[in-house]
Regions:
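Conserved catalytic cores of soluble enzyme domains
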Residues: 1-61
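Short acidic (Asp/Glu) and glycine-rich catalytic loops that position anionic groups and cofactors
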Residues: 4-6, 26-33, 72-80, 131-134
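Non-catalytic terminal/interface segments that mediate subunit docking, oligomerization
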Residues: 89-142
Length: 142
């Protein structure tokens, strides 16, 4: 998806770009932020859509679907004791905090290639769907 093609770009800027660089899936999922998901196959696309819809209600009058989980709600996640470094200037991966506390340690990330200093996605806590927005200290200090 682009307004003008590679030939016009070459004429105006003397830069050589192909259609994928100019407006392909990776460009829009990593640079422009137009796309939220990027899939390689139609099957993968349909699976991603199903997964996304599993977190959302069917309409504004319903609750999001409840998914039973067998995780112990009193479980201790020892790894959380060491994720955040003692030095406040050291980076860490926020997903190392998000994933262990979610049901089945599963986090469905939205826009994983765009604005890597922010993490956005869905998960479940005790079977209930939750949306997550967090700074990502591992990139650009969050």
């Amino acid at each position: 998806m682009f307004i003008t093609g590679p030939d016009v770009v070459k004429t105006v800027t003397h830069e050589e770009v192909d259609k994928e660089e100019l407006g392909g899936a990776y460009t829009h999922s990593s640079k422009s932020g137009v796309t939220h998901f990027m899939c390689n196959t139609e099957e993968e696309t349909l699976m991603s859509i199903r997964e996304l819809l599993s977190f959302l209600p069917s309409n504004n009058m319903e609750d999001a679907p409840f998914t039973p989980c067998s995780d112990d709600i009193h479980r201790r996640v020892e790894a959380l004791q060491t994720v955040i470094p003692e030095d406040p200037n050291m980076p860490y991966d926020i997903k190392d905090i998000i994933e262990p506390v979610l049901d089945n340690q599963y986090f469905f990330e939205v826009m994983p290639h765009f604005a890597k200093n922010v993490v956005i996605g869905f998960g479940r806590l005790n079977g209930r769907s939750v949306g997550i927005v967090a700074n990502q200290p591992a990139y650009l200090a969050g």
